[in-house]
């Protein structure tokens, strides 16, 4: 229990960056990350024998996702002139995958981990709500001056559908997981507390003001609505979705009117995204070395980092905006294949054992992978490590 509390404290300290805290110093964040990764390595080293004695269904996948990016150091040096030391610093976040092994050492329960994810989701919701009323006095999720200049903004936040859009660096990952979990609980036993939490989480997804996230969450809920045993469960799911659809239809103009107008008038933005995908895809496949290993991940103050900044400033080309194509540019084809192999194992190989809410999360993030890569950034590494550990708990339990 003490170790679990220590883990919780460390993750909470670093998670202030996950909420994009305005006063959080990037340099301090880097040093915090180095210390956390060093600690993870040390714990794994001293518990190596305990780890190898366990059956870890996703060990090979974790190792690939953690180590394949290291292969980009060579092409990044040869093609992009970024030194191996700078590349290693830029790739340090990938070692957060080590938490998968630490969870198998500490063995927290699924209930405890879901509680922690739920707390994070509720914190996100309250930040979204409170800052709508306190802006411009806010602590999280605004652009700095450089980002405002790059995006041509007059304010440090975007306004969509009449609401402020705060970028909390979570992409709805905590919220989606708990949303899908609560949905599953509602299907088995309709209780007021589940209903209230579900509505709060659905509102939080909407307040992200990210069209892809809203659509993929709703589509996934519909796709999985009729999964499950028992006619009562399916009838309850149908009735709930029916009433939810009526509410959405009545308030459609207020909730989504500006989204529809923005989508209709965003031809230029869509064209830029297509051109960006063509550019990064072409520059990846032209060289066999970068095709398989990628161009590497840039460190901000390097020639390579400034080159990508110039692409963003002058052309609006961001690798992160084109999903797995952009991450193939960073880490190569082998890395992207490793993600799809992982998704295949969760959804098909171990489908009988994996909890439905985890399958829903994998489907939801996969549906938008052409625009938002599912394994992008520290918080995704952390959350996926937790979910894969929970999958292992169910797989091990089924074999007893």
Which sequence ranges carry the predicted segments?
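Hydrophobic transmembrane helix bundles of membrane-integrated enzymes that assemble
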Residues: 3-6, 10-262, 279-282, 313-400
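Long extracytoplasmic/lumenal interhelical loops at the membrane interface
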Residues: 263-331
């Amino acid at each position: 229990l003490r170790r679990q509390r220590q883990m919780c404290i460390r993750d909470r300290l670093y998670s202030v960056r996950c909420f994009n805290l305005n006063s959080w110093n990037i340099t301090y964040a880097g040093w915090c990350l180095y210390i956390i990764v060093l600690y993870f390595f040390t714990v794994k080293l001293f518990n190596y024998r305990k780890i190898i004695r366990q059956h870890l269904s996703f060990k090979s996948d974790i190792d690939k996702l953690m180590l394949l990016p290291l292969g980009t150091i060579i092409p990044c040096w040869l093609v992009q002139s970024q030194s191996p030391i700078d590349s290693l610093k830029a790739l340090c976040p990938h070692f957060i995958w080590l938490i998968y092994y630490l969870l198998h050492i500490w063995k927290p329960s699924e209930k405890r981990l879901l509680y922690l994810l739920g707390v994070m989701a509720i914190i996100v919701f309250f930040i979204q709500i409170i800052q709508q009323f306190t802006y411009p006095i806010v602590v999280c999720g605004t652009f700095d001056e450089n980002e405002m200049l790059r995006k041509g903004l007059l304010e440090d936040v975007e306004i969509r559908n009449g609401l402020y859009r705060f970028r909390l660096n979570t992409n709805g990952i905590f919220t989606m997981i708990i949303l899908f979990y609560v949905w599953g609980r509602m299907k088995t036993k309709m209780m007021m507390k589940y209903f209230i939490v579900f509505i709060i989480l659905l509102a939080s997804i909407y307040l992200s003001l990210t069209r892809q996230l809203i659509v993929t969450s709703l589509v996934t809920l519909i796709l999985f609505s009729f999964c499950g045993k028992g006619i009562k469960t399916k009838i309850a799911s149908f009735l709930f979705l029916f009433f939810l659809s009526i509410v959405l239809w009545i308030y459609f103009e207020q909730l989504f009117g500006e989204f529809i107008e923005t989508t209709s008038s965003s031809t230029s933005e869509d064209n830029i995204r297509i051109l960006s995908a063509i550019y990064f895809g072409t520059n990846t496949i032209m060289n066999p070395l970068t095709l398989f290993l990628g161009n590497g991940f840039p460190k901000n103050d390097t020639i390579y980092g400034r080159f990508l900044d110039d692409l963003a400033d002058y052309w609006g080309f961001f690798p992160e905006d084109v999903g797995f194509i952009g991450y193939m540019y960073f880490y190569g084809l082998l890395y992207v294949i490793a993600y799809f192999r992982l998704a295949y194992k969760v959804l098909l190989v171990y489908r009988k054992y994996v909890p439905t809410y985890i399958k829903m999360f994998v489907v939801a993030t996969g549906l938008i992978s052409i625009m938002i890569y599912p394994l992008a950034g520290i918080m995704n590494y952390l959350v996926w490590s937790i979910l894969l550990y929970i999958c292992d708990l169910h797989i091990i339990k089924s074999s007893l």
